[in-house]
Amino acid sequence: MTLSAAPLQHWRQTLAEKRQQLADAYRADRDAPAFLRRYSQAVDQTLAALWREQGLDGQAALAAVGGYGRGQLFPCSDVDILILLPDPTPAEINDKVSHFIGLMWDIGLEIGHSVRTLDECLREAAGDITIETNLLENRLVAGPAEPWRELMRRLEAQRDPLAFFEGKTLEQQQRHTRHFGVSNNLEPNLKESPGGLRDLHTILWISKAAGLGDNWDSLVRRGILTLAEARLIKHSEEQLQKLRVDLHLLARRREDRLIFDLQQQVAQAWGLADTPAKRASEQLMQLYFRAAKTVNQLNGILLPNLRGRIYCQVPRVTQHISEYFHAVNGMLGIREVNVFDKHPHAILEAFLTLQRHPELSGFAPRMLRALWHGRSQINDRFRSDPRNRATFMQIFREPSGLTRTLRRMNLYGILGQYLPNFGQIVGQMQHDLFHVYTVDEHILMVVRNLRRFAISAYNHEYPFLSRLINDFERPEVLYLAGLFHDIAKGRGGDHSQLGIADADAFCRDHGLAEEDCQLVAWLVGQHLTMSSIAQKQDIYDPETVQRFAELVRTPRRLAALYLLTVADIRGTSPKVWNTWKAKLLEDLYHATLRVLSRGGEIDLASELEARKNQARAQLRLHAIPDAAEAGLWAQLDTVYFLRHEAKEIAWHARVLNRQLSPDTPQVRARLADDHEGLQVLIYSPDKPELFARACAFFGRTNYSIADAKVYTTRHGYALDTFHVFVPEHHDGDYRDMINFIEFELAAALATDQPLQLPPQGRISRHLKHFPITPQVSIRPDDKDSDFILSIVAGDRPGLLARIAKVLADYRLNVRSAKIMTLGGRAEDSFQVSGAALKDDKTALALEAALITALRI
């Protein structure tokens, strides 16, 4: 039977109106399970009516499968159906079925269909676990019931619960691997990510395949799930379902990822609003991550318990370990089921015991459940018990296993229960464009990085840091500083300062020596300082090093801050750390250590002479004649030698000693010492906009500037040095890039044509949806001779060129530029001079012009 245009329009409109009614009802009551159930029923009614109209009701069975078969149809999900044909199948049925499927699309349903006979269903299910799973959630919608019942009986008889369990658990492991990583943290998939809806489906699929029930209440009745666990899992499931319904309704398409574009809108649908401490989207993501964490925890408890029900009882191979614990089939188990109720101190001892027995693969199923329920024993009395405090500290003092232990404690909610302030930051996302992990994950990543420095198997990664930490007495203070450095995030205010009190109280409560208490608290308060100085100040200026040395005071504090700084930067995002930052930090460390070794004082005259002598030695290695550098050096003052390393001084003298006064710009480039990027030297008669033209050139050619030192010689020549990073996906070799820069940049600097800024360029999706408010500050430097211009803005191609153009327009001289890019966030610092900065009205106009240039 063929429907005319009028009935088609009727069905299309009826379905659209029903969808709208259900969506409106959902927005009013926010009841996701009810929406899913009602939408499934509405589609049932539509399909059944059309099935009958096509004359198929008595000839073939129509069944709902997959999520639709489960009665959980999301707004824009596919409607998965099975059409069960008789065998043999008359030709007219095939024609009707084809027309029926076309009708589904015509009225606005996205159909996922399979058309099979009973034997074909059995054969396909036997060979493909995905099809077997799809048919497991199978509900008759229309047509004769007996063929469908026969299919259900034969599928059940054919099913192997053991093989199904192994297949689905392997599938889950592979899915977790695919969806684990940076992109998943920022835009998690509500269905597929670890702790997502699919993890809940996996539990119920396995349970149903084993005949143990297909819902949470059934698992409670079977003793597989407790009432408390069922309440938690239902709540988390509903949270995830609500998020997914909201995503579909807002996107108007099947969108299962919490993408940047929609996070703020979903947060508004949840009634969340920005606060001074947290964006609404950050609050939303914390709700998601906590729900996912609960699912992850319970999935880890329930799957081992289901395994025990499905498999034939494996003989228990036990080995005595302690009063409370024994090894059970290669896992740590409890000797009594209520051990944590009787002896709460055994909770932390369980983690310490597993840490000391790396041959054990984890906690046995009974132990996992006992730990889960034992969390409630961790209260103020538990936290103040000296025995528990000693056990917690011993975990940090063990020679191995700290990272795994802390991650286990976090996974099962023990760490946040023992340290309530840590519990507050669990699942907290940071939309600052460079942290890609939740705060708790970032903290544990930092501790992991510190531990990795200390493990001999990884000495090759950071040899110097490995030597440093292995010479560090009582390294547990470093791990505690890592644990507390960001613990005050999200409270509002400066988290570094707020965290000092938490760290100090913990250390004193846990019996650390006064010296160590002070060190941990100091590290928490100063954990951003070394990174900021290295990337925003001139670390080759002895006075900068002197000030930093006065802050750190001792080699032990210097080493501790250096180790924590590297671990922290590497723990924010895989893309933030690079060898340029590594070099800056290591150079600052060594320079500061030299000052401390001399009693904290710098002899500027000796420092200058030492640099010149080192530069001379390098020139002689390149067969440059004695005193060849004298002509150039006569044009350079003390400031030049203070701001450049000996290697740079030697390079400049080597390439410029024969051309002190060229008429045209000279450009030389070389591979940087760290082999990450290029050093570019510009030597030219000084003129306005020279720095801006160089920045514009690098912006047009997609080279990103990390550092710039701008200097004018006594005889009026610009001697500028840039450190630039190579464009991503660049196919040419370094020699080609060097030749290109030396020729093209020299030509760009020589022209008298008006300055052409590079195109503004595309910004990242992350920055588009979480923009950074531009900030500009101008202050005198420590000598009151120049000014420090600090800028914070969202990074994009050509940003630095626009800043340089504004500075040129106001006739400001740039003496140095420190460029710090953290993900999509630019934090740039310039040392500048010029009359405009001494007039308050002009300085305000400059700030306004910069803000305009920084806006996206």
Curated annotation (Swiss-Prot):
EC number(s) recorded for this UniProt protein: 2.7.7.59, 3.1.4.-
Cleavable signal peptide: none
Ranges of residues in domain HD: 439-561
One annotated GO molecular function: phosphoric diester hydrolase activity
Gene Ontology biological-process entries: regulation of nitrogen utilization
Cofactor(s) this protein requires: Mg(2+)
Region feature Uridylyltransferase, mapped onto this chain: 1-320
Region (Uridylyl-removing): 321-678
Catalytic activity annotation: [protein-PII]-L-tyrosine + UTP = [protein-PII]-uridylyl-L-tyrosine + diphosphate; [protein-PII]-uridylyl-L-tyrosine + H2O = [protein-PII]-L-tyrosine + UMP + H(+)
Record PROSITE patterns: ACT (PS51671), HD (PS51831)
Pfam family, one: GlnD_UR_UTase
CDD domains (UniProt xref): ACT_ACR-UUR-like_2 (cd04899), ACT_UUR-like_1 (cd04900), HDc (cd00077), NT_GlnE_GlnD_like (cd05401)
Regulation: Uridylyltransferase (UTase) activity is inhibited by glutamine, while glutamine activates uridylyl-removing (UR) activity.
Function: Modifies, by uridylylation and deuridylylation, the PII regulatory proteins (GlnB and homologs), in response to the nitrogen status of the cell that GlnD senses through the glutamine level. Under low glutamine levels, catalyzes the conversion of the PII proteins and UTP to PII-UMP and PPi, while under higher glutamine levels, GlnD hydrolyzes PII-UMP to PII and UMP (deuridylylation). Thus, controls uridylylation state and activity of the PII proteins, and plays an important role in the regulation of nitrogen assimilation and metabolism.
Similarity comment: Belongs to the GlnD family.
Comment text on domains: Has four distinct domains: an N-terminal nucleotidyltransferase (NT) domain responsible for UTase activity, a central HD domain that encodes UR activity, and two C-terminal ACT domains that seem to have a role in glutamine sensing.
Protein's UniProt name: Bifunctional uridylyltransferase/uridylyl-removing enzyme
Source species of the chain: Chromobacterium violaceum (strain ATCC 12472 / DSM 30191 / JCM 1249 / CCUG 213 / NBRC 12614 / NCIMB 9131 / NCTC 9757 / MK)
